[in-house]
Amino acid sequence: MMKTVRTPILEIGFLELGPPDGPPVILLHGWPSDVHDYDGVAPPLGEAGFRVLVPWLRGYGPTWFLDPATPRSGQQAALGADLRDFMDALAIPRAILVGYDWGGRAACVAAALWPERVSALVSITGYGIQDIAASARPGSAEQEHRYWYQWYFHTERGRAGLTANRVEMTRLLWRLWSPNWVFDDATLRATTASFDNPDFVDVTIQSYRHRYGNAPGDPAYDDLEVRLAAQPPIRAPTIVLHGEDDGVGPAAASIPRDRLLTGLRERRLIPRAGHFLARENPADVVAAVVRLAASAA
């Protein structure tokens, strides 16, 4: 069931499943995607007794900015603060967080900056806090090639391309990043409808430019960005899941940052899974949440 809640910045649309008095689990989607990432995860968790919340991030679907003057920023501090504010608005003191890509970044930011709010973390692809100061250093030629869309978004041609071709770009990236996932047009269209949000393009472009220091952030988050620049550790009990065939973020590349997950309990490489692991292997995500919840009981 779709609900909405207001924070100081946003009206956030979200799905809620399971008993209202169950242990809260917040599932956070990635880009280019939306809450449908967790269609195979949320119902089993709800049936297992968890209170499951699946919000649309800023710039997606029914999540709206309250003030036209608020900068349409997709920077990491904003995503993390939105998550904290979402929990505050619903009077949730602590939750298990699950996320990947943009949603994984929001979860990691919240876990690092407000550890008292996070009882456990399932981080799909690992430590997700950006090291913006180091972003000027180039990666391997292969990795630079994987990030072609990010360089594209640094141009006004890229902004125009995302505006005009967001459905076909999503189809292409899904195929490149999860090469073994077979999806149909109805699945694609169900998600890309969320990109009709009038702020989707602006939030996306700002996010990809800001992470390389090529766009200013919202000054409201300057203090948080300073804290994130220190690459703070995440102490919450954590399970990392990584798709063996992730076409944008290879598993080997994330392992060195495991040292920042000081509560790491387990890292699992999922055979044949790609970037959209929660869609491809939802049972693995459900199992990770259940294991962490059991260990915390």
Stretches with model-predicted labels:
Residues 37, 82, 203, 284, ...:
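Charged catalytic carboxylate motif
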Residues 273-281:
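Catalytic histidine-centered segment of alpha/beta-hydrolase-like enzymes
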Residues 267-273:
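Short glycine-rich catalytic loops that host catalytic nucleophiles or stabilize transition states
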Residues 15-65:
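Conserved HGGG/HGGXW glycine-rich cap/lid loop of the alpha/beta-hydrolase fold
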Residues 1-25, 47-50, 92, 226, ...:
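Alpha/beta-hydrolase fold catalytic core
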Residues 11-12, 24, 60-94, 98, ...:
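Flexible "cap/lid" subdomain of the alpha/beta-hydrolase fold that forms the substrate-access gate
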Residues 30, 101, 279-280:
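Conserved acidic functional residues
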Residues 41, 110, 288-292:
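Hydrophobic residues on the short alpha-helix immediately C-terminal to a glycine-rich phosphate/catalytic loop
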